[in-house]
Swiss-Prot record:
Keyword check for Transport: no
InterPro entries: Anhydro_N_Ac-Mur_kinase, ATPase_NBD
Keywords: ATP-binding, Carbohydrate metabolism, Kinase, Nucleotide-binding, Transferase
Stated role: Catalyzes the specific phosphorylation of 1,6-anhydro-N-acetylmuramic acid (anhMurNAc) with the simultaneous cleavage of the 1,6-anhydro ring, generating MurNAc-6-P. Is required for the utilization of anhMurNAc either imported from the medium or derived from its own cell wall murein, and thus plays a role in cell wall recycling.
Biological pathway: Amino-sugar metabolism; 1,6-anhydro-N-acetylmuramate degradation; Cell wall biogenesis; peptidoglycan recycling
Entry protein name: Anhydro-N-acetylmuramic acid kinase
Amino acid sequence: MDFFYIGVMSGSSLDGIDIALLKQDDRSRLLATHYIPMPEDLHAELLGLCSSGADELARAAIAEQKWCRLVAQGVQTLLQDQNMVPAQIRAIGSHGQTIRHEPSRGYSIQIGNPALLAELTEITVVSDFRRRDIAAGGQGAPLVPAFHEALFDDNKDHRAVLNIGGFSNLSLIESDRPVEGFDCGPGNVLLDAWISSQLHESYDKDGAWSASGKVDSALLQKLLSDQFFLTKGPKSTGREVFNLGWVKHHLFQSKTLAPEDVQATLLELTALTITDSLKSAQPITRELLVCGGGAHNKALMKRLAELLPDTEVSSTEKFGVNPDWVEAMAFAWLAHCCLEGVPANRPTVTGAKGRRVLGAIYPA
């Protein structure tokens, strides 16, 4: 039977909200999309909630209502554009907005008010995907490797899927064993934070500013000495660890560098932590498929290819899947798994003690 789902993803980069319409039968097909740029005031509020501050509970409650109403408007626009009505959609899979992720302390917090979203859209909402995995001893992240396996596993060995959003994560796909995966470290988060602090730009288009600088090996080695990079998976991370303050802490201990050299070094950090992780976990990788915003960073993609000379590095576009929409598609698929009672976590990815059905259901 064919079902229609909507997936909603707002990642750690906080740049906007991705909404994807999916047709789900024996495979997942992307039908339509809608993108909402994050309003500046809401971006600032959400970024502030990612670190300790005053009156956090009230601020989070207000921010998630604003976020939710934006999503509801986006869903309605998407349906209108497709001449569809809410009754045709089986469910919305809403990731929400992560404001804290500390699985070592037993929690990951995504705000988004799924009850209000169900009320505003008149569509069943599935949300809160991470906490069941954490309850079972897992990291609660990354959750997309199971979807990567479903989407890109055509019985070819030695394939990996790399998602580069605010943070980077790998899915290792082999035909004879369950998918494996983990967070590698910062993706765009440090690159975006540094260029914002220096040039007041939201991101480094094509990695051009990074490409104009030179890597400082001393700073790079200091950054690579972080305990996260020395830890084997399963592992996940977030803004609690990697943020502008983390960069400035290491810069304080270094010689004065040109801003573009810092950016070049941060790009090298992203590239090296990805490729070193891949070589360690899957020594032979014939094909690396890249999705997420980082797939558009030409300097980063070029560096990945240089560091992996025996691996074909390409965008998921090669499979006819737009790299910008893979995560939103994944949460539509996760909603489908929840309603079908299909476990969607992978213990080989998160470290949970078993497979679990993920998500909480808010009926229309």
